[in-house]
């Protein structure tokens, strides 16, 4: 059986480097189709940027797992992988970066005098050090800035400053059920609450609390840190991805989010997929949401950030 994989960007002709204004999607596509510098995406799988090699010439995936069993011409997976339990995506990527097979693959496919560019979703300060030592360009914001902005508390504060507010909430610290109830009552949040801690996957750091029994169940994960306490709404979850460039914020299409489906995730508040269709938002809601995302992007730019970010748009039905 033949496997058809779109790799048309790999066969596009080279072009001289130049910085010029790109005015539409066609020009953006041409710009990336003539890219001469190898770009490698690192990850457990190629899921996050699947299909980008159709747009970007010299774009390859270096992954721990190979879903194509060697059939995809632009996916590289080391053949020798001793059993190892990873605690995070960062650990997987750092392991791949230091793997001899991976380093040999990059060296063999990168022209002399060219510094390969590295992209990934999960990285940390160790990743930066490894890339620096190997002579790779990690084309991402500094890990310290990303960690700072990854806090749900910080992004809530920045959103408020930018005029892109969240669901009614209060940022606070609580030590017991009485403290949580008092903070929620003072903020007018009602009796059904959603509590988030600053860092971590939404499914593991989002807690639905409407009784003291709920509090006892989750308190060990909440006490001792600043939290975001929100009014629980009848939410239709929507997500949008945007890119902050030197020319401003480009907002992508709005997608519905799949949250908490038991067959797909063990977590009540856990993300488990997206769907995209025209009626995700009404025209007015889409226009308003686009403006709010751009405001947040402008505020992130003031922090020195540039690159991709994702925003959850909560629609109270």
Language model region names:
Residues 1-148, 177-179:
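ATP-binding N-terminal substructure of ATP-dependent carboxylate-amine bond-forming enzymes
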Residues 50-51, 128-129, 139-141, 202-205, ...:
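Short helix/loop capping segments that flank catalytic or ligand/cofactor-binding pockets
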Residues 122, 173, 199, 231-233, ...:
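Short, flexible loop/turn elements at secondary-structure junctions
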Residues 132-205:
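A conserved helix-loop-beta module that forms one wall/lid of the active-site cleft
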Residues 165-167, 188-194, 208-239, 295-302:
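Conserved ATP-binding module of the ATP-grasp superfamily
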Residues 168-169, 192-216, 237-239, 261-281:
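Glycine-rich phosphate-binding loop of ATP-grasp-fold ATP-dependent ligases
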Residues 234, 242-300, 317:
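ATP-dependent carboxylate/phosphate-activation module, predominantly the ATP-grasp catalytic core
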Residues 241, 304-316:
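A short glycine-rich, hydrophobically flanked beta-strand micro-motif that places a catalytic Asp/Glu
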